[in-house]
């Protein structure tokens, strides 16, 4: 973790009158919360897909054996929707969320045109961004796990819903 990040955390704690008891990297903290100790003996990858980055932690033999990050995440998908549908970023994010539970969505583009779009049509348009996200995560998992696929991959985080 970069020194400036640690110093910022310590400064915030000090201003709040608190002391640091421990500092854990986010992917390791996620594993500790989401994967029971009995499952950590298995070779499992936990991928936390956030807005800007996807954090990856891998377990085997009861412990975290590797962790890493790729700079591709949910915002890439939102940007692709924005580009293809001519939506500003907040409306593209809203459309992305609506696609999770609806087969069609109604959007108004930046020119004021209202269009009803089918989920499959949108997914086809943004498939290059989806492929980049999945390929980046897959490549990093293999790199972290000595070029072998883990027994399971668990997806968490807001970006995992897309």
PLM features: what roles do these ranges have?
Residues 129-138:
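A general structural motif
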Residues 1-44, 63-65, 74, 89, ...:
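Nucleotide/phosphate-binding catalytic cleft detector across ATP-hydrolyzing
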Residues 13, 48, 81, 137, ...:
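Residue-level signature of catalytic and energy-coupling elements of molecular machines
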Residues 3, 51-53, 159-162:
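Gly/Ser/Thr-rich loops at beta-strand to alpha-helix junctions
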Residues 1, 22, 48, 69, ...:
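Small/polar loops that bind or transfer phosphate-bearing groups
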Residues 37-67, 81:
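Gly/Thr-rich phosphate-binding beta-strand-loop-beta motif of the actin/hexokinase/Hsp70
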Residues 151-160:
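Glycine-rich beta-strand-to-loop/alpha-helix junction loops that act as flexible
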Residues 60-95:
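Metal-dependent phosphodiester-processing active-site neighborhood
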